[in-house]
């Protein structure tokens, strides 16, 4: 699924993206079949409900996909910036895109002090790379470290994993709408249609809710597994493109430290974009359960991989004194 660029291909990522979409598709089809079967058994008007839900769900999914870049920028309070407004940022991205032989995405800046970055868009032609003012002006990144962050984000565009994450999330949205239509249909109309079969309606809604919970849990875990791997793939590809894994190590460390200094309330407001961020907008606590459901691999795991890449490139290992 990777675009034709000089970013190192990642077969593991391609396999995982394909498997995730296939499994999510199967889960979605099975869920629709479950709703139809349950409502048919209860003599409810399943066909009309499914049709209406698919129309509304498909429409909202299409709008969300088509305007995914604008929606993400609005959520971040970001605006696009021209080369005149952000010459250094554009200069670094120009060099990286030339090095990777890929189309340059639009660039945007978010006014938040949270140090972070993300890439989004329905395809490479409509991609946008957004960085925060916190990353540009308050994280103390060197130019090489900022270049490492941007190379990581451009890798997501080149590998097309941003698109897969968007598609996967939309399937969950449509499934949720199916449940709502089924629920409200039976809540407000089921008893009148079924006469003395109200006990069937009472049983139908909990079963649909249970099916919904199972679908959500499976979708959640599949998306989280893909999300964590794609971050490792972007770290690796970005480090290999720049040939400077140590700069990315330093950037990860500085950004994570900067996030830990952000008030918890501000971090919560950034949660909707967590899956797309360079580093998760959460405070590091080392809790095992939190790591299982995390959108990103642990900082230690990411740094360990980059240290191994340093050795592969024949570069010195990590500085025992910490950041250089």
Language-model region placement:
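Hydrophobic alpha-helical transmembrane segments of polytopic membrane proteins
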Residues: 207-217
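Polar-ligand-bearing catalytic/cofactor-coordination segments
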Residues: 1-26, 42, 49-51, 58-202, ...
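Short, hydrophobic transmembrane alpha-helix segments
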Residues: 32-46
